[in-house]
Amino acid sequence: MTTQSQFLVNLSYGGLASQSNLRANNRVSPSSCQITRTNRSWALPVSFKVEKFQLQRGRRRRGSPCFGESEGLVKNGIGDADGIIIVDHGSRRRESNLMLEEFVKMFKEKTGYPIVEPAHMELAEPSIKDAFSLCVQQGAKRVVVSPFFLFPGRHWHTDIPSLTADAAKEFSGISYLITAPLGPHNLLLDVVNDRIQHCLSHVEGDADECLVCAGTNKCKLYNSS
């Protein structure tokens, strides 16, 4: 019988509301991890419990809509008329922007989704408007904007929705959705641990630099003075 355990996720964001007003300004639903805006300030909960489920008969049980382990395993109709935009912040460094293009290429090959475009929120092209237009040109009737951000902040609450709405004004009959950022997803635990282990192996001389660090000479041990 599948057992259920819980772990505590601590989140804080001081740029939009003080912690003293946190619980007064927002209502947190433990089952959906959604935050309801009740005044003009956005805030995140100081802490909340997230359910975690183990495997049962070879597949994962459906977990929380925001943080469940089963995210991405239940298909919900991504088809030929859907376009996906993966948007990051954008950088003045060309190398950083090229990494998003490489990630989008990997994502498209892995998922088989026909319409996937990269976009940068600012500082670089293609913009969200550019990517939205490319999706529509390829036949998309619904555009899914996926922020390549770890946690929700001003860019997710305000900037990306505003830029996407402006892009959508150019077209009629096109719907769009802005998904949640990555958040404390269970799969990210493995990603972070893998990165740590690889970099430790590199500084010990047992592994080459990863693609992110390659040529930067950043992945090395520093000694405090």
Swiss-Prot record:
- Give its E.C. classification number: 4.99.1.4
Q: Where is the transit peptide?
A: 1-46
Q: Which residues take part in binding [4Fe-4S] cluster 1?
A: C199, C210
Q: What does this protein do?
A: Chelates iron to the siroheme precursor. Catalyzes the last step of the siroheme biosynthesis. Unlike its counterparts in bacteria, contains an [Fe-S] cluster which is not involved directly in the enzymatic reaction, but may play regulatory role in iron, sulfur and tetrapyrrole metabolism. The [Fe-S] cluster is required for normal plant growth.
Q: Which Gene3D superfamilies match?
A: 3.40.50.1400
An MF annotation (GO) of this entry: metal ion binding
Q: What happens when the gene is disrupted?
A: Post-germination growth arrest.
Where does this one sit in the cell?
A: Plastid, Chloroplast
The consequence of C213A is: Impairs [4Fe-4S] cluster binding. No effect on enzymatic activity
Protein's name according to its UniProt entry? Sirohydrochlorin ferrochelatase, chloroplastic
The GO cellular component terms are:
chloroplast
Highest taxon above the source species: Eukaryota
The entry marks the following residues as binding Fe cation, namely H89, H155
- Is Glycosyltransferase set as a keyword in this record? no
Pathway, per UniProt?
Answer: Porphyrin-containing compound metabolism; siroheme biosynthesis; siroheme from sirohydrochlorin: step 1/1
Q: Identify the Pfam families for this entry.
A: CbiX
Q: Which family does it belong to?
A: Belongs to the CbiX family. SirB subfamily.
User: InterPro entries in the record, alphabetically?
Assistant: CbiX-like (IPR002762), Sirohydro_Cobaltochel/CbiX (IPR050963)
Q: Tell me the organism.
A: Arabidopsis thaliana (Mouse-ear cress)
Instruction: Cite the cofactor comment.
Output: Binds 2 [4Fe-4S] clusters per dimer. The [4Fe-4S] cluster quickly oxidizes to a [2Fe-2S] form in the presence of oxygen.
Gene Ontology BP annotations: response to oxidative stress; siroheme biosynthetic process
Listed binding positions for [4Fe-4S] cluster 2 are C213, C219
Which SUPFAM superfamilies does this one have? Chelatase
